[in-house]
């Protein structure tokens, strides 16, 4: 790479970043529109479906690309969210506790609900995101003992979204994937 191409690559990166910011703002606005015009239940269902589809399309291929598929399920799931979000520019924290338990945290400000938009989002909508993606990682990994426990949510007035992947001794019931414990 020469010095002459650096400004061109930087300009290209800024253009792509602008498109990403535009799509992100559109998505957030769309969710807020559904909340105000159709109600919380419809907005939660919409968010659930978007995130479940993304999870089904991206999670397993992403584990392979990131070199995580050999890890224990709880660790693989948490590291996937840590690395894939960092690559996408989202600040995430990760902590390994054991092969059966790994923690993730999305500190404020929350990327997904940028700025003051977070004030217009009911907790049910944020929980739908976790039900759509995080709760289905064990199913995708063919380990039905893997669940996700959410311990904090920004939309509920707490300092960030955080929780942990846990491999239980037995498969949790469908409605216990994820668990919301505070």
Model-derived regions, located:
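N-terminal accessory segment detector
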Residues: 1-103, 110-129, 136-182
């Amino acid at each position: 790479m020469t010095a002459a191409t650096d400004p061109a690559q930087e300009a290209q990166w800024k253009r792509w970043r602008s498109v990403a910011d535009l799509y992100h703002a559109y998505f957030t606005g769309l969710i807020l529109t559904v909340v105000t015009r159709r109600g919380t239940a419809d907005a939660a269902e919409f968010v659930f479906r978007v995130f479940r589809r993304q999870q089904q399309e991206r999670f397993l291929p992403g584990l392979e690309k990131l070199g995580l598929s050999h890890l224990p399920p709880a660790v693989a799931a948490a590291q996937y969210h840590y690395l894939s979000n960092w690559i996408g520019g989202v600040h995430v924290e990760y902590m390994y506790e054991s092969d059966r338990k790994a923690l993730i945290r999305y500190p404020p400000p929350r990327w997904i609900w940028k700025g003051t938009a977070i004030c217009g989002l009911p907790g049910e909508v944020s929980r739908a995101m976790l039900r759509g993606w995080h709760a289905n990682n064990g199913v995708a990994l063919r380990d039905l003992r893997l669940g996700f426990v959410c311990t904090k949510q920004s939309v509920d007035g707490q300092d960030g979204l955080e929780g942990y992947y846990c491999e239980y001794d037995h498969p949790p019931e469908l409605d216990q994937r994820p668990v919301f414990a505070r």
